[in-house]
Amino acid sequence: MKLVQTIKELQSELDALRSEGKTIGLVPTMGALHAGHASLVKRAVAENDVVVVSDFVNPTQFNDKNDLAKYPRTLDADCELLEKVGAAFVFAPSVEEIYPEPDTRQFSYAPLDTVMEGRFRPGHFNGVCQIVSKLFMIVNPTRAYFGEKDFQQLAIIREMVKQIGFNGLEIVGCPIVREEDGLALSSRNARLSAVEREYALNISQTLFKSCTFAKSHPVAETQKFVEDAIAAAPGLRLEYFEIVDGTTLQKITDWEDTDYAVGCITVFCGEVRLIDNIKYKG
C-alpha cells in the first residue's frame, strides 16, 4: 500500500494501472476510519483491481468551524487499517493541494439538497459535491463507494453523477454497519463519553422498534412514536426525524405513497450530532 499526498503522483500511478486495463475503485473518506469504512473498502477490493481511499477532512462541507476543529484526525491508524483490508493507495492531500484557490462552484440538486441535512446545514452539500467531484476528476474511478448511513448524501451524489456523467462512473451504496448493540458506526462516536454512548443507543433502538410499530400504524403515528421516544430518552435532543420517499427524499403521508420509505433522523447527544436511518419499505 502506498501513501500519496499529491494529485500529480496519484494520477501518474493510476494512469499506468489504467493503461494495463485495471479497474479502479474509490472510497472517499474524511479519515477517523472505523469498521464501517473497512466494509466499504473490502467491497471495493472485491469488485476492482485497485482501490484508492481518500483520507481528507474537507473544510468546505463544514458549516460549523467548531465542528471542523473537533473532527478527529488519525492518519497513522487509518493507514494501518487500510493496509489490512487491501487498499492499494491512500490519498491524503493537504487542503492547499485540493484547494489551491477557493472553490466557488455552486451545485444545486433541489429538492434533494434542500430538505433534512440541507435545511439544517446550509452549504454542507455544496461542499460535499465540491470535494467528491474533485476526487472523481482526480481519480477517474470505475466505481465509487459510499455508506447508506449518509443516506441523503448518497442520493445527491447519485444525482450529481447522473447529471455530470464522470465517464460512466458507477456509484455503489453499501449498508449501514452497526456495533453489536445496534449503534451506527460513526467517526463522531469517538467524541461520546461512556454515559453519552449509552444514551446514543436509544437512537437505533427507537428506529428498530418503529419498524415493528409501522407495520400496523400510519405514517403520522410512526413519526410521533419516534419523536416521543427520543424526547423521553435521557441526554438526547432531536433535530429532525422525517419519513421520506427513498428516491426523492420528499416526505410521505401514507405508506402507499411509495414502494421505498426511509426514516432519517438526526439527534444531538451532548454536543455530538449523530445521524441514522432505517428502511420501512423497499
From Swiss-Prot:
Q: Which residues bind beta-alanine?
A: Q61
- Reply yes or no: does the keyword Chloroplast apply: no
Q: Which CDD domains match?
A: PanC (cd00560)
UniProt keyword list? ATP-binding, Cytoplasm, Ligase, Nucleotide-binding, Pantothenate biosynthesis
Q: What does this protein do?
A: Catalyzes the condensation of pantoate with beta-alanine in an ATP-dependent reaction via a pantoyl-adenylate intermediate.
Q: What is the superkingdom listed in this entry's lineage?
A: Bacteria
Share an example GO biological-process annotation for this protein: pantothenate biosynthetic process
- Where is (R)-pantoate annotated to bind? Q61, Q153
Q: Does the keyword GTP-binding apply?
A: no
Q: What is its main location?
A: cytoplasm
The UniProt similarity line reads: Belongs to the pantothenate synthetase family.
| NCBIfam families associated with the record | panC (TIGR00018)
- Write out the annotated subcellular location: Cytoplasm
Q: Name one GO molecular function term.
A: pantoate-beta-alanine ligase activity
Write the protein's name. Answer: Pantothenate synthetase
Enzyme Commission number, as recorded:
6.3.2.1
Can you supply one Gene Ontology CC term for this chain's record?
cytosol
Which HAMAP family does UniProt cross-reference here? PanC
Per UniProt, ATP binds at: 30-37, 147-150, 177, 185-188
Q: Which reaction does it catalyse?
A: (R)-pantoate + beta-alanine + ATP = (R)-pantothenate + AMP + diphosphate + H(+)
Q: Where is the active site?
A: H37 (proton donor)
Subunit composition and interactions:
Homodimer.
InterPro entries for this protein: Pantoate_ligase (IPR003721), Pantoate_ligase_C (IPR042176), Rossmann-like_a/b/a_fold (IPR014729)
Query: Which pathway does this chain act in?
Result: Cofactor biosynthesis; (R)-pantothenate biosynthesis; (R)-pantothenate from (R)-pantoate and beta-alanine: step 1/1
State any further remark: The reaction proceeds by a bi uni uni bi ping pong mechanism.
